[in-house]
Amino acid sequence: MSAYFSDWTAGAAEALAGRVAHYVFISSGAVYRPSTEYPWRESTPFGPVPMWGNYGREKVASERLLWDAHAAGTFLVTSLRFPFILGPANFADRESFAFGRLEAGRPILLPGEGRTLNQYVYAEDVARAIVTATEQPETAGGQAYNCAHERPITNRGWVELCADVLGVEANLVPIDEAALGVAAETIDLTNIVFPFPSEHVVLDGSKLTRELGVETAVGNRRMIEEYAAWWEKQAVKPALRSYARENAALTALGLPTV
């Protein structure tokens, strides 16, 4: 089960107590306290995570609540911690952010010159991890697992990969968010400049493979190729979403807004 808010988790835990033996929680790499030692393992301490704001705090609170329930014998708990999930029909404006702008020949702004490393996982690998965890409670119970493809990629590299798959040129514009007056202390997915953070997120997913036999086999290129195949089948492409921070930066640079 997933939850954006810890009170959702509290309600679910109360409702399921005595009714289920194993609770698999869909968590996030946003629970980890920022560290300059990469990759982050499951033993990396919990936040606070300033970049993720309330989202990270609520995921941490949810996990703490569930681990308390596990310790009390309410049910077994497994936490699956994901980075950014990609795949066809993604409701989050990730692939669609890049594809729409690339096909329209629009500039894509890259905070910090796009050097930040981020990590992804394909939706089918996510599903495989969830199913496997539920099928192996004797191993997965009481454990947390990162689930991510092993090779991170820079933000610039990710956009260039999207452009290569589409067969178009990328119009990349490196920016300094602070200098343009559009910097933000926390991530607000309703008001972005770029869909991924400007701080490294790199997880170690080897425990998932070692203990549960789950391999995140779909690499960065194939993730984009699978999305591109879905994208090309859409009679009406997802509309470009407009963001105030992105438009403010474009205006400051003298570029047309979305």
Question: Predicted regions span which residues?
Answer:
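Substrate-positioning beta->alpha
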Residues: 92-98, 111-135, 142-143
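Hydrophobic "lid"/C-terminal helical patch
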Residues: 66, 130-134, 162, 220, ...
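Short-chain dehydrogenase/reductase
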Residues: 38-64, 92-96, 119-120, 152
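NAD(P)-cofactor binding segment of oxidoreductase domains
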Residues: 1-40, 50, 63-68
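Conserved sequence/active-site signature of Rossmann-fold short-chain dehydrogenase/reductase
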Residues: 31, 85-87, 126
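A short C-terminal helix-loop "cap" of Rossmann-like NAD(P)-dependent dehydrogenase/epimerase domains
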Residues: 45, 99-111, 168-173
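Mid/C-terminal beta-alpha module of Rossmann-like enzyme folds, strongest
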Residues: 133-193, 205, 211, 225-226, ...
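Conserved beta-loop-beta element that borders a ligand/cofactor-binding pocket
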Residues: 63-89
